[in-house]
Curated annotation (Swiss-Prot):
A GO term, aspect molecular function: 5-hydroxy-L-tryptophan decarboxylase activity
Biological processes, Gene Ontology terms: amino acid metabolic process; carboxylic acid metabolic process
Keyword terms of this UniProt record: Decarboxylase, Lyase, Pyridoxal phosphate
Short name of any one Pfam family annotated for the protein: Pyridoxal_deC
Top-level taxonomy: Eukaryota, Viridiplantae, Streptophyta, Embryophyta, Tracheophyta
Protein name per UniProt: Tyrosine/DOPA decarboxylase 2
Amino acid sequence: MGSLNTEDVLENSSAFGVTNPLDPEEFRRQGHMIIDFLADYYRDVEKYPVRSQVEPGYLRKRLPETAPYNPESIETILQDVTTEIIPGLTHWQSPNYYAYFPSSGSVAGFLGEMLSTGFNVVGFNWMSSPAATELESVVMDWFGKMLNLPESFLFSGSGGGVLQGTSCEAILCTLTAARDRKLNKIGREHIGRLVVYGSDQTHCALQKAAQVAGINPKNFRAIKTFKENSFGLSAATLREVILEDIEAGLIPLFVCPTVGTTSSTAVDPISPICEVAKEYEMWVHVDAAYAGSACICPEFRHFIDGVEEADSFSLNAHKWFFTTLDCCCLWVKDPSALVKALSTNPEYLRNKATESRQVVDYKDWQIALSRRFRSLKLWMVLRSYGVTNLRNFLRSHVKMAKTFEGLICMDGRFEITVPRTFAMVCFRLLPPKTIKVYDNGVHQNGNGVVPLRDENENLVLANKLNQVYLETVNATGSVYMTHAVVGGVYMIRFAVGSTLTEERHVIYAWKILQEHADLILGKFSEADFSS
């Protein structure tokens, strides 16, 4: 037999003297410190560069190569958070953050997350934590009623709702359910003939879900959209593509209209798309990840008209509903389709409650087994602010976006590239008048008359100009915006949605944009943007 060395004996014996990792008083002391730390962070968040200014690999150079052998104090750790971690953060909660889509937070959302994490239950089935399951079904019905969803999507009717991590998971789960429902009718050997449809503006989550679900990559359709339809998916074009696929021996399976696309917040017409899908027995999933939250406001509800004809509907409460990441709300008309596709029932999970068929086991509504108590934070948000205040928060963001849109329209150097629908404005800086095209077939610059540049060359020049312009603005650290390319046009996205953003911040962002427009146009040289 071997023998323990002295260091091992000392290490093992001293471990019995270590403070319990869940000591209540230490939890109280350190918890207060963390709350104070975060409160100070939000008080001062406006002072930080919105986008991190670090270079790739910065953190590995600053941190030790191995974990500490002995414990370190919370004070030391928080000091390192300040000096090492915060410089590497892009501050999504900054009032000057307008990039991507918002990840709006709130006190209620943060504290709900704290409660959820603090309880640390794993609610894979009803028995594992009844409150986690039952609260989820309650808040999903609450939220569904706020959206005026039909009873067919609610537990009070024949459907039901579940909290997923993200829209990617929601789309994958519904696509998997649609796949199995179809293959159970036609035979699993036909999986290679199934086709999934979206538009060229549909989120990439649909394509990834199709790959994971085993759909032939050649059978994924990203149908082209056009400016005259505000880049929405045309039901007529969808029908044409479906008919071509049927003629080729393929089988239409799934279509995903979007309410508020990522690039431009375009809205696909739900009802006409559902009419087409119904003819070919397709599953319709409505992805309202960004804009769905706004539909609790009566003036925006019409954007999801026709949802009663769809099979499933999802939105991200962690985007524009003041609930921390992650919290995707998914409603389905036929929960049994999800359960049949995703259910497993090993012996070690069997219990009387499940066998009674009187409870929901959410493990069968998702990909993973384990699941977080997400409903607690959504419940706290709904209760802490109420429907009236939540509507007013959303309206305030739309109002600020309208203000920004008005400022853009007042300056002839800019143009709105797509219509504003919600709280995001898409715009671009126009090339200077020194390259204006004249009717006589030539254009002028500072050096005199030069041959006419064709439309494509003008577009390339304008796109490069806006790319450089956006990079210059973001490099200041004062504001942060991102871009999209829609219809070949490079445009800047200004997405209002941070909980801390006020009108003064929007005015501040506009002044920065104006200042840098002055600079970049003042030294404009065609050669600078032609490469």
